[in-house]
Amino acid sequence: MQLLSNLVTITGVLGLPLLAAILFAGSALLMKRTAGWGIEIWRVSFVCNVVSMVAFQPFWFLAGDLPAWSLWWQPLVVALLYVVGQVLTLTSLSQGEISVAAPVLGLKIVFVPIFLWLLGAGLLPVSTWVACLGATLAVMLLNTTDAVGDRGRVVFSLVTAMSGAAAFALFDVCVQLWSPTWGRGAFLPVMMGMSTLLSFVLFPFFKQPLRSIPRDAWPSLSGAAALIALQAVAIVASVAFWEQVAVSNVVYSTRGLWSLAAVWLLGRYLGASDSSLTPRVLLLRTAGALLLFGSIALLVFV
């Protein structure tokens, strides 16, 4: 019985985030293919949010009695953090320098233990802090490019990406702290439903209406949205049910590694090849991959 319990815990804390990371890599490939149809990221994000809302509804089967109305502000705050983080991240990636924004977004991993401490959830073991810092540096190395941008765009990217990373980190921490009060099953679908309603703020950013999306673009767009939804279910369920948000985020950070591997292996066939892989970039990304695996090993074996 103890062995079964340990296997379930390992699956929840490590397996689900790893599955989410791999699913994210698949969605990244389809996102690149979708971008080829000229669909801006705001419409893509709205579609992904709607599909994610649907994917979270089966959690109602695990729900018990709903809490008092006085607690319904909690999923609203978490939903707001999700949408704010999404807007800031997409703004940084679309309007700023990707070579700056992508590595800075990796700071989410180290923001998580900081917010846990600030919100009174207690201090994490030293090994977890070291793993979070190592994974953060690894993500930055994995996102290395030789691109150079102007100073103004660099500062803009730095501020928006860091703010987006902080919002998503606080989102994860609040899911862990507040979902137990709701019996977990109810909190997740309510929160995602609220975030989808809040996603209507994206409408002003649409360059064209949703109905103008080409019919031939829907297979890749719907596939990307489905994978995004499934990876969200996996990582959020891990945080909500097993309450190891710092560990889950370190494992989930491998999504960048799987994305790079997927682009390298399959990008040519899906029209999503990476032209930035110079010898210097390859060396730094390899170092990042090794550091990331070392950070995960620290969590598992120490």
Report each predicted region and the residues it spans.
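Glycine-/small-residue-enriched transmembrane alpha-helix faces in small-molecule transporters
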Residues: M1-W42, D150-A186, G193, L221-F241, ...
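Membrane-interface helix-cap regions at the ends of transmembrane helices
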Residues: Q2-L7, S52-S70, I114, L118, ...
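Loop-to-transmembrane-helix transition segments
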Residues: G12-A20, V47, V54-L88, L105, ...
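Transmembrane alpha-helices of multi-pass small-molecule transport proteins
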Residues: L19-V84, G134-L137, F187-P209, T254-G267, ...
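Membrane-interface helix caps of multi-pass small-molecule transporters
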Residues: L30-R33, W37, T91, Q95, ...
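Structural motif at transmembrane-helix junctions in multi-pass transporters
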Residues: W37-R43, L88-V104, P180-F187, A234-G256
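Hydrophobic transmembrane alpha-helices of multi-pass small-molecule transport proteins
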Residues: V51, F56, L107, P113-W117, ...
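Membrane-interface helix-loop-helix junctions at boundaries between adjacent transmembrane segments
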Residues: G85-S127, T144
